């Protein structure tokens, strides 16, 4: 019996691989998309997350014709302000200053392209409350380095989990991939593990 189309994960995130494994989905290969993630002028956080997820999926689908391609992008926003993926201490300090003592939104866009070219997307929005951070908490978190490469400068599954006062929505989405919605996309477009 011939194998069906492969599932390609268009992400280098080990967290997304771990989340998929939790629900019994193992991509056949990982092929990260390297795209410009700069927000467009006047782009809302919702549109930004969906656009990036779909763009990543399309870039990888062009390299993997006939396969399923799954991509996601997670955006942290305070109001309409999209926070960066923290790469420097200045980035994380900027993010923590905006997040401290406030609620914010974590939006994860998910895109799936089927072997026949059909595409489907989902957006999951989660409201997250952050405690007011003391200087010692902020400095300790910065020193930990756990913020590197994370949207909004934090990962809920690490030390920053202790800063979360409230989470309304999808915990896996805040980590990087909403599992319920992802499984529905996969089954809806005909993926069978």
Curated annotation (Swiss-Prot):
GO terms for biological process: nucleotide metabolic process. It comes from Caulobacter vibrioides (strain ATCC 19089 / CIP 103742 / CB 15) (Caulobacter crescentus). Belongs to the Maf family. YhdE subfamily. Nucleoside triphosphate pyrophosphatase that hydrolyzes dTTP and UTP. May have a dual role in cell division arrest and in preventing the incorporation of modified nucleotides into cellular nucleic acids. It is an enzyme of class 3 (hydrolase). Its EC number is 3.6.1.9. GO terms for cellular component: cytoplasm. Pfam families: Maf. This is dTTP/UTP pyrophosphatase. CDD domains: Maf. The record marks 15, 74, 157 as: Important for substrate specificity.
